[in-house]
Regions:
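PAPS-dependent sulfotransferase catalytic domain
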Residues: 1-55, 65-80, 84, 162
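Surface-exposed, flexible loop/turn segments at secondary-structure boundaries
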Residues: 42-43, 91, 122
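PAPS-dependent sulfotransferases, especially Golgi type II membrane carbohydrate sulfotransferases
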Residues: 49, 57, 68, 72-76, ...
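Acceptor-substrate binding/catalytic loop of class I
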Residues: 58-65, 92
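Short acidic donor-binding/metal-coordinating loop in glycosyltransferase active sites
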Residues: 86-89
Length: 178
């Protein structure tokens, strides 16, 4: 981050693997603020299976569930000034007010240009990498609920059997979800 934007006063990293190292990161950066970008676990699992193949279903379910537990345990140690939860669905459906809330949390001014991230040269160079191909596009919400199309009935049943409690607690289940 510091190489691409040397003037940056705030930097971040969104690697999900960091959920395994939160206590250590907190020791190194004791004033760090944490934003949990929460997404429907079914869509997360669906995305991972699409990327890694059908054999990854078990691992994807386990990773989402384990990461969620680790984040929930860790955030209890933080003051409200150091932790914010943002729903992915809110970010893509209502990007401006959600981003304003995030900016307030991290202590920077919101600008309309932030929604034009996909036009930045640093974004353009990454959008050609398969994993980051959507960086070159404006915010879109068509990936919400994609699990219904991407996962087979058998896969959906497995996901629901293993994530129903968490999905319910987070408010992701409704009457149509059985």
């Amino acid at each position: 981050a510091s190489q691409s934007f040397p003037e940056a006063k705030v930097w971040g990293d969104q690697s999900p693997i960091h959920t395994f190292y939160l206590p250590y990161i907190n020791k190194v950066f004791p004033r760090a603020r944490y934003m949990h970008l929460l997404r429907d676990g079914r869509d997360v699992v669906s995305s991972m299976v699409t990327r890694h193949g059908d054999d990854y279903l078990f691992e994807a379910v386990l990773r989402w569930k384990t990461s969620l537990k680790r984040i929930n345990r860790f955030q209890k140690e933080l003051t409200p000034e150091r932790y914010i939860e943002v729903r992915y669905e809110n970010l893509v459906r209502e990007p401006e007010p959600t981003l304003q809330k995030v900016c307030e949390f991290i202590g920077i001014d919101y600008t309309q240009r932030m929604l034009d991230y996909w036009k930045l040269p640093s974004t353009i160079e990454h959008k050609y990498k398969t994993f980051h191909q959507n960086l070159g596009k404006p915010v879109f919400d068509s990936s919400i609920g994609k699990w219904r199309e991407r996962l087979s009935k058998q896969q959906q049943d497995y996901v629901m059997k293993n994530l129903a409690v968490e999905l319910h607690e987070l408010g992701y289940l409704d009457a149509s979800d059985g």
